[in-house]
């Protein structure tokens, strides 16, 4: 996905924004040529299976999927697991979709990409992956972001902010999502790269995993504070909820007064946390557009259009 890179000041804190390009935002995509006219001739049924619907980011993705269905004149059902660790629940949804033979295409954001690749190996159902790529020749296209690039951008900005905040020794610790998840691991790699390039040090051995849940991020932050009573310059997190949770956990400790807390997402809760002085900055991604373009890609494939491998 081509990205527009924007920067904006929010209550004195830098909010890095990497929004989906692909010819424009979802509002612009709605007017994308002949696609809608072609689609209204068919009553396509698209099943969308997301990682979860429990978090604000995934609700944005789901809303984009539904809007694409309305604009393109197709039926879209959006499903999601109860959490980002409910692996069996999502696999069951995918298996049911594959065996039910009641839809024309499937859009999926996999929790376990390798397992899903095996699961879809023998299907003829058109499949589009979103958010997290699936290494399978059954997947027609991937709609998403380069998570390493996003995190690297946040890492670089965090180091610059830490310098301005007066930190001499700039070290960073990550509170990340699900251990082994490709998105989480890519973001760790990106944060590490961006921080190093800007002159900081990412403490890889001290990475905490909190399953993308704010409450678990609080527990992770408490462990970091216990291990580093002197303070840490930067805390990077897999999403905004976790970054804000970590900041709340550290609020009572003077050594963490100037710590830079960085998340990824840019949802309303994240922006509110920045304005409230909790989270310092976020790398904002347009989940709505990811969902919209995922459904649009599925419809284009059903209409015989050859898709780009990476949208």
What do the predicted segments below correspond to?
Residues 1-12:
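Positively charged n-region of N-terminal signal peptides that target proteins for export
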Residues 5, 22-311:
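A residue-level marker of the well-folded mature domains of exported/periplasmic proteins
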Residues 17-21:
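C-terminal motif of bacterial Sec signal peptides marking the signal peptidase cleavage site
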């Amino acid at each position: 996905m081509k990205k527009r890179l924007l920067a904006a000041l929010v209550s004195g804190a830098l909010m890095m924004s990497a929004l989906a390009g692909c010819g424009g935002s979802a509002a612009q995509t709605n007017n994308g040529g002949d696609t809608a006219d072609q689609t209204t001739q068919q009553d396509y049924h698209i099943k969308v299976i997301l990682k979860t619907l429990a978090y604000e980011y995934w609700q944005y993705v789901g809303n984009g999927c539904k809007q694409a269905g309305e604009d393109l004149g197709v039926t879209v059902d959006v499903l999601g697991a109860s959490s980002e660790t409910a692996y069996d629940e999502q696999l069951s949804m995918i298996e049911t979709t594959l065996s039910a033979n009641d839809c024309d295409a499937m859009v999926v954001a996999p929790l376990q990409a390798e397992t899903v690749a095996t699961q879809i190996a023998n299907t003829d159902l058109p499949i589009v992956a979103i958010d997290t790529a699936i290494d399978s020749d059954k997947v027609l296209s991937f709609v998403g972001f380069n998570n390493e690039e996003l995190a690297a951008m946040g890492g670089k900005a965090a180091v610059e902010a830490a310098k301005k905040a007066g930190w001499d020794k700039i070290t960073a610790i990550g509170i990340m999502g699900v251990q082994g998840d490709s998105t989480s691991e890519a973001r760790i790699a990106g944060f590490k790269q961006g921080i190093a390039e800007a002159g900081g040090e990412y403490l890889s051995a001290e990475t905490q995993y909190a399953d993308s849940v704010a409450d678990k991020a609080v527990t992770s932050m408490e462990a970091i504070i216990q291990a580093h009573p002197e303070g840490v310059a930067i805390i990077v997190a897999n999403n905004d909820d976790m970054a804000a949770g970590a900041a709340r956990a550290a609020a009572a400790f003077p050594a963490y007064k100037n710590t830079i807390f960085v998340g990824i997402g840019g949802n309303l809760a994240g922006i509110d946390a920045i304005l409230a002085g909790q989270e310092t900055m976020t790398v904002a991604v347009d989940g709505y557009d990811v969902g919209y373009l995922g459904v649009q890609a599925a419809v284009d494939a059903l209409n015989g259009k050859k898709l780009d491998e990476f949208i």
